[in-house]
Amino acid sequence: MSGERAKRFPLALEDLKREPRKPEGRVAERQAAGDAARQRLTAAAAVPAAASPIVPERRAPHGGVFAANPARAKQHAPAAPGAAKRAPQGGAKQGDRSAAPNVALSGALALTSERVRERMVERLRANGVADPRVLAAMSAVPRHMFVDPGLAAQAYEDAALPIGHQQTISKPSVVARMIELAAAGRALERVLEIGTGCGYQAAVLSRVARDVYSIERVKPLYERAKLNLRPLRVPNIRLHYGDGRVGLPAAAPFDAIVIAAAGLDVPRALLEQLAIGGRLVAPVGEQAGEQVLTLVERVAPAQWRESRLDRVFFVPLKSGVI
């Protein structure tokens, strides 16, 4: 280039290259953010991912898979047919080993144990029951089998319990007391029970006497007593559906008669069916008033001796059948 031209154009061609303009405003911010994101992605791709060790799988003999890796075993385990539809039974979650045991079943098993009945017998002995035959019978007969399942927890308490149809099962102490009074240390051949109820007292009597006759006027209770006694396989009890105030003249005389209901007096028919030297035990008195456990002994064909003993409370003695 001539000197004259150089003077007119003082800048060379390379001097005319412009520097790129820096982005301005929001466009600049977005571009900067994009550049930073690309840099992070590039850095992440450059770092190799940590690979989990691969454990070779072994084939099970029957087509399953043995996996040394528990996680993989759980992941690849084949589901049982219908497993998704089946729900855990019994209300407890599967695999929950800390689930509470069946309290009702545990309670029932405890009630059937001999130790529970023995504690009841010890209380009877402490309250004055001394006849070893009566104590052994009370220990042997499972009272909880004669009450409703909902009352089983109270079966060996000294309490009268409802059995339906406005009737009750007598307290163990009263049952033992009446049987001991009726036996009086004698060997009993024939015993008549008035008021079978659920069958418990008849079962106890069957272990003290050779033959037991029992009358129940309420048909559903008569049927229930048969069902209750059947599992015990008691061979010497004869149940009758009928009017207890009439007794069983065809089977008389009886060494002992036990009446499990209270009347204003003892029915004459029952006194006549008592053997000479026999003993009758019955509650006597009004339903709303005082009832007294009464012992009647037949000392001669036309002579009876009466003793009034303990205050008690029984359901009323009624005539007829229902």
UniProtKB/Swiss-Prot annotation:
Active site per database record: 170
Q: What is the species of this protein? A: Burkholderia pseudomallei (strain 668)
Give the encoding gene's name.
Answer: pcm
Question: Domain of life, per the record?
Answer: Bacteria
Tell me where it mainly resides: cytoplasm
> Which family is this sequence assigned to?
Belongs to the methyltransferase superfamily. L-isoaspartyl/D-aspartyl protein methyltransferase family.
Q: Where is this region: Disordered?
A: 1-101
- From start to end residue, where is composition biased (Low complexity)? 33-51, 67-91
**UniProt-annotated location(s):** Cytoplasm
Q: Identify the PANTHER family for this entry.
A: PROTEIN-L-ISOASPARTATE O-METHYLTRANSFERASE, PROTEIN-L-ISOASPARTATE(D-ASPARTATE) O-METHYLTRANSFERASE
- The UniProt record lists the keyword S-adenosyl-L-methionine: yes
Function of this protein? Catalyzes the methyl esterification of L-isoaspartyl residues in peptides and proteins that result from spontaneous decomposition of normal L-aspartyl and L-asparaginyl residues. It plays a role in the repair and/or degradation of damaged proteins.
Q: Which UniProt keywords apply?
A: Cytoplasm, Methyltransferase, S-adenosyl-L-methionine, Transferase
* Enzyme Commission identifier(s): 2.1.1.77
Reaction(s) catalysed by this chain's protein: [protein]-L-isoaspartate + S-adenosyl-L-methionine = [protein]-L-isoaspartate alpha-methyl ester + S-adenosyl-L-homocysteine
Output the Pfam families linked to this UniProt entry.
PCMT (PF01135)
Checking InterPro entries in the record gives:
PCMT, SAM-dependent_MTases_sf
Please tell me whether the keyword Cytoplasm is annotated for this protein: yes
- A GO MF label: protein-L-isoaspartate (D-aspartate) O-methyltransferase activity
Q: What is this protein called?
A: Protein-L-isoaspartate O-methyltransferase
UniProt GO cellular component terms: cytoplasm
- Composition-biased stretches (Basic and acidic residues): 14-29
A GO BP term here is: protein repair
